[in-house]
A protein has these predicted regions:
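Amphipathic alpha-helical segments typified by the pilin-like N-terminal helix
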Residues: 2, 6-48
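Short, well-structured segments within or immediately adjacent to enzyme catalytic domains
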Residues: 42-297
Length: 297
């Protein structure tokens, strides 16, 4: 009796086994490579968008006697929300008095002036590395009869639609183009303030290292002061002269000033400082204080 001749090809079971073995070798290589490529792409987008915001700021300043965007009116203070972000008038939006002074405004309302007056898209204020933040769409909040240039903020919960921290524009130390060119005016989200993706980082984990004046912390402790969105590696920072750079430490301002904290000095920057809260003010003209609005529950 003749025996059947075995085919030289693989059975389907053998094909599956070989495929799984190959994938076991290839996936550990391809997945991290894809993740790294995605991170690089997000970082490039964040830097480009922050640069575009910077150009719009300088254009705005050119139309307003050198003043960078500051919402509200004279004497307006930093508050948790606007009186009415979709109001018909500025007075109604910020709760100004009959002299068009006072009232409260969010940090993001000042950035929103770039949407109103300079045609910057709300998408430009969303960094893909900032989790929990999405592009502002008025329709989501029931506003269907107004254009984005007719509104006053990124909704009643602007922290969910604006990734970037901005120097406090209300009070005695608002920035103008007369400040030093290397003054930090905006950056990735402040790590000491609650974000859409989680609570503020514990400040006790942070200490400046030897790269700062008087720094005694370790490299890991210094990295704990960086923005969360870039795996503690640093943050993109916009300076007054319009350039954007990736700073590996948060104390990249004037006099090694920490851009995310209030300086403990009344005359200079401070690499440590104290974490800000709603209503905080810079300590002096050299103190960059880049903050975000609180997240509305």
């Amino acid at each position: 009796m003749c025996r059947p001749v075995k085919s030289g090809g693989l059975t389907w079971i053998e094909v599956v086994v070989v495929t799984l073995v190959v994938l076991g070798f290839v996936l550990p290589i391809l997945v991290p490579a894809y993740q790294r490529e995605r991170i690089v792409s997000l970082n490039v987008d964040c830097a480009r968008q922050l640069s575009d915001v910077g150009k719009a700021m300088l254009s705005y300043a050119g139309d307003y006697d050198g003043a960078l965007p500051a919402a509200g009116g004279r004497g307006t203070k930093w508050g948790p929300k606007l009186n009415n972000w979709s109001a018909a008038t500025r007075s109604q939006a910020f709760g100004l008095d009959t002299n068009q002074t006072g009232g409260e405004a969010t940090i993001s309302a000042s950035l929103y002036l770039l949407v109103r007056h300079n045609g910057v898209s709300p998408e430009s204020f969303v960094c893909g590395a900032d989790k929990g933040v999405t592009e502002f769409r008025p329709q989501k909040y029931g506003v269907i009869d107004r254009g984005i240039a007719d509104l006053w903020d990124f909704s009643a919960n602007p922290a969910r639609h604006c990734s970037y921290a901005y120097h406090v524009p209300y009070g005695a130390y608002a920035v103008t183009t007369s400040n030093e060119p290397s003054f930090a005016v905006a950056a990735d989200r402040n790590p000491w303030m609650k974000s859409p993706s989680g609570n503020a980082r514990p400040f006790t984990d942070f200490r400046p290292d030897a790269g700062a004046k008087g720094g005694t912390g370790t490299s890991d402790q210094a990295r704990k002061g960086n923005a969360v969105g870039h795996q503690n590696n640093g943050q993109y920072v916009l300076f007054l002269d319009g350039h954007v750079e990736f700073a590996k430490r948060a104390y990249c301002g004037l006099d090694d000033d920490n851009i995310y904290t209030v300086s403990s000095s009344q005359a200079a920057g401070d690499p440590l400082g104290t974490p800000p809260k709603l209503g905080s003010q810079p300590a002096n003209r050299k103190d960059s204080l880049l903050v975000n609005d609180p997240v509305v529950p």
